[in-house]
A protein has these predicted regions:
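Catalytic domains of riboflavin
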Residues: 1-271
Length: 271
């Protein structure tokens, strides 16, 4: 039998008979289904599809360079947004987040974008449209979710963590403004070595949405609109975020009552 020399194809072959006991509290099992080349407007990638036993959804990874066995891999978790990604909605910044994330990764030696089928922060497309209708009547994005009986964010990252494990990624530099993603991945055993900020300038339709994410959901967003894609290695202070006396101490992210509290971050200091 010919053994593939390509690292991704070796993983795919290995996963044809993959049958693990599950990963994390939910016993999530993920395996690679297929690998192909995918040229895009943002650059050339390889696309990897996955099976999983958690939600029966077909999540994919967009991969740049050789990430198998690598550490400090620039990684973006992008949740599906039909209205933004495909239809160009201006109510959110999802399409810009997706495209700019791919462009950023395409400039690097290696990187990953996980495209997760978690429409509407996990509440699904129909409920997202219902939430939009409530926002049309004056509620913000958090209030709309709560009014429908959901939490602010219903997403779960167990599958994403196992996707990274299946790709044999040793540690990630997470491209995110969301401290909950850092906390979730860390909780599932993923080593997050640092954060790369990913702020998109707002438009007149999504400015309030982005302000709400910063003020109410704890996202690290400077919603003044300045483009910002640099890696955060120095202490930062963002309007609406915890004050200077809330700076990380002893390797913990924020105070115990702040989103992301207690996340071990070996090389990151945030306010």
């Amino acid at each position: 039998m010919n053994v593939p020399t390509d690292p991704l194809m070796r993983l795919a072959d290995r996963d044809q008979e993959h049958d693990c006991e599950g990963y994390g509290p939910g016993k999530v099992c993920v395996r690679i289904a297929a690998v192909a080349e995918l040229p895009t407007r943002a650059g050339h990638f390889r696309i990897v599809s996955f099976y999983n036993n958690r939600d029966a959804k077909e999540h994919v990874a967009m991969i740049r360079g050789n990430i198998v066995g690598a550490g400090d891999v620039a990684t973006r978790l992008h949740s599906e947004c039909l209205t933004g990604d495909a239809l160009g909605s201006l109510r959110c910044d999802c399409r810009d987040q997706l495209l700019e994330g791919l462009k950023l990764i395409s400039t690097m030696e290696r990187g990953i974008l996980l495209y997760l089928r978690q429409e509407g922060r996990g509440i699904g497309l129909i409920n997202k449209i219902r939430a939009y209708a409530l926002q049309d009547r004056g509620l913000d994005t958090v209030e709309a979710n709560l009014a429908l009986g959901f939490r602010d964010d219903e997403r779960d990252y167990a599958v994403a963590a196992h996707m990274l494990k299946s790709l044999d990624v040793q540690s990630v530099r997470l491209i995110t403004n969301n401290p909950n993603k850092i906390r979730a991945l860390t909780g599932y055993g993923v080593t997050v070595s640092s954060r790369i900020s990913h702020v998109i300038p707002p438009n007149e339709h999504n400015r309030f949405y982005l302000e709400t994410k910063a003020k109410r959901s704890g996202h690290y967003i400077d919603y003044s609109g300045k483009p910002h894609l640099t890696e955060q290695s120095d202490a930062i202070l963002i309007d609406g975020m915890p004050a200077p006396d809330d700076v990380i101490d002893n390797g913990e992210l924020g105070r115990n009552d702040q989103p992301g509290a207690g996340v071990p971050m070996s090389r990151l200091t945030l306010k």
